[in-house]
Structure formats: C-alpha cells, structure tokens
C-alpha cells in the first residue's frame, strides 16, 4: 500500500485520517507519510523511502529510534507485565532520578501525557492558592485542556485556530493572556486582576517555533509571582532534558514553583509528570483535597523507558555539548545558505532544539512568528521531503537533534537545504 492509499483509507475510519491534527500535512499542501519503522536518526515510510528525521516523535527520542538500552529496559518490564494499576518500584526509582537534580522540587506525580501534566498542575495551583484565574502567554501551547486552549501555539497555530470550538466562555474567562517576552503586559494584567492562581509559561517556547524567553524577563516574572502569592509553573514538557539535562533550569537557574515534564521523561512511551515542593504536592489526593488520577499513570513500561533514557542522558556528560554543536552547525548553515540566496530566514537553537522562521525580522514572540512567510515554508518543506529530510510540517514547531546524528548527517541536510533553496 502506498502513502496516498493509506491516507485515503485512514480518512474513512479515523477523524481527519490522523490522531493529532498537525500530522495530516494539510498546511504544507501534501499528504502525510505513513511510517513503517525507524532506526537511529532515520525513519522509513511504507513506500520504501528513508528520511533523516528531525521530528523525533515531536521530541521524546533523545537517543533516536530503536535505542538498544531503552528497548532492553522495555522488554524486561514487559516480560513482567504491561500494567497493574498498582504501585511499582519503577515509579519510585524514576521519581528519585528526576528529583535528585532539582533542589527546589521535593515530590512528583506521574501522568500519561503533557496535557494531563499541565492540567493537573493548574488545578493544583488553584487548590493551593484558593484563587481562580490563570495567566498564560500568547503562542505558548500547554496541551488541549479547555482552560489552556486559548491563544495557543503548536497545532492550534498551524491551523490558524489558536482557540477552539467547544471551549466555553465561562471557562476561557478565567484565562488571562500576556505577550511573550513582554513584562509590561504581565504587570498590566496583575494590576487589573488580584486573583491569579498561577502563571504558566514555556520558558523555552517550542510551540510557536523555537522562541526562548529572555533571562531578565523570566527573572522579573518570578519576582512578580512571588510578590503576588502566585505560583509560577514552568512547562518543560518539551524543553526538559532537551534544552539541557536540567531543561531551562540548567540554563536560567530560575526555580519555578511547579515544573511539568514529558516527552524525554518517557523515553518514547506515554509518560509525563508534574513536580513541586512538598507543601504544594501534599494537597493532592489521597493526602489532600485536589483530585488527580489515571488508569495508566506510572505504568511500568513507560517508567522503565524513562529510567533508561534519563540514566543514559545523565551518564553521557558530553552528550548535550555534542547535540548543541550539531544544532548550531545546522542552523548557522541554513542561515548562510539563505543569505546567499537572498531569502529571509531567522534561526535559533537551544541545546538539541532548533527552529527557523521565513521572515526578515527577529522573532521574540508569537506576533513576530506570525510574520513568517508560510507559502515559502510550505515550498521549502516539500523540497526537503523530496530530498530525504523529514521536518515538522508546520512553521510553528520545533526541530530536534538526536544522539545518533553526526556531522555527516548535518552536512547531508545542509546540501538538501541548498538544493531546496535553489528550487524556491
């Protein structure tokens, strides 16, 4: 079966033919590639084509596809059982592994997705502060729970619908939206609203494209939250163990009240978490009145994969230096080639994360990102795919370097960029 036929058949039985909207390739005027398997830095579609994969399952695969250590850990766990709905030693082991490197985090709760993590973190913040409103930033995506699907990035931005039908006005009215990297917009909202339970932010935004928050902005944001008895939530579902081993904390050293984790923490399996100091976490049920639960939360396969992934990342002390150098080589190479061709391009990388925008102006917030030439991006994406390079099919997503990549792969990619730019 070909990709084209597979998508046509999928559309008969699956809403939109995909189980997450951006996978449909609708905004790049193409059909999705149906993947048969992956190995290292590569994925292979059912038509027999191979691609250098810079999506890496949208970030979780720090060590690429079919990493032997993670596979071995999963196989060992599966041999004992896939799920029990009861505590296992693996949960405590992964909890200790995560918390050991964050001095301000004392307890953690595992869930199955980033959406669950951010949704639960906000409920926890509201329960702890006894306040109702939350403040988020335009273009930041924190999953698809109702209160957070307001002025969102990621797939919502890709389909030009940063909010969603079905989100009730009575829910959305409690969500305040500030401008990313603009502290004055935050101050204005705090002046007008005295019941803000929490501020949630991607400290390294990856869902409007890659846009890091500025150090002074984050420092001032933390001060404002502290002065107003408002909890600061860092959504590190994407940037955790990607921007550095300690995520944004390893770069900006700002201690958020709550951190959400995901993607890499599950090693490619469904796992996420939220963590905070004990006085906050202890109001979660069964100790306190904030309810949160999940049938597959902390399931042994995901815990085993997470332990293998984080243990390997922690041991390989030079891993993040290598990934950062490759991301830098890729983005600087793209910028040089664009300049030679006279194409408008802004590039960025943080650790193993990278982004690029087809615009002549620097990008520091969502409105800047929206100035990108989407038609140009679509042509570029199609050309790159034809040249064997698999990039996220959206201008508003982040790319990822994995440990199985090297200089040769980056050189191959840059040659594809050169050829793609020639055809634009």
From Swiss-Prot:
CDD domains membership: OAT_like
GO cellular component, one term: cytoplasm
Family annotation (InterPro entries): 4pyrrol_synth_GluAld_NH2Trfase, Aminotrans_3, Aminotrans_3_PPA_site, PyrdxlP-dep_Trfase, PyrdxlP-dep_Trfase_major, PyrdxlP-dep_Trfase_small
Cofactors that this protein relies on: pyridoxal 5'-phosphate
Modified residues (N6-(pyridoxal phosphate)lysine): 263
EC number: 5.4.3.8
Catalyzed reaction equations: (S)-4-amino-5-oxopentanoate = 5-aminolevulinate
One matching Pfam family: Aminotran_3
UniProt GO BP: protoporphyrinogen IX biosynthetic process
Record field: transmembrane: none
GO MF term list: glutamate-1-semialdehyde 2,1-aminomutase activity; pyridoxal phosphate binding; transaminase activity
Associated pathway: Porphyrin-containing compound metabolism; protoporphyrin-IX biosynthesis; 5-aminolevulinate from L-glutamyl-tRNA(Glu): step 2/2
Keyword line: Cytoplasm, Isomerase, Porphyrin biosynthesis, Pyridoxal phosphate
Homology family: Belongs to the class-III pyridoxal-phosphate-dependent aminotransferase family. HemL subfamily.
NCBIfam families in the record: hemL, PRK00062.1
Subunit structure comment from the entry: Homodimer.
Official protein name in the record: Glutamate-1-semialdehyde 2,1-aminomutase
Lineage, top ranks: Bacteria, Pseudomonadati, Campylobacterota, Epsilonproteobacteria, Campylobacterales
Encoding gene per record: hemL
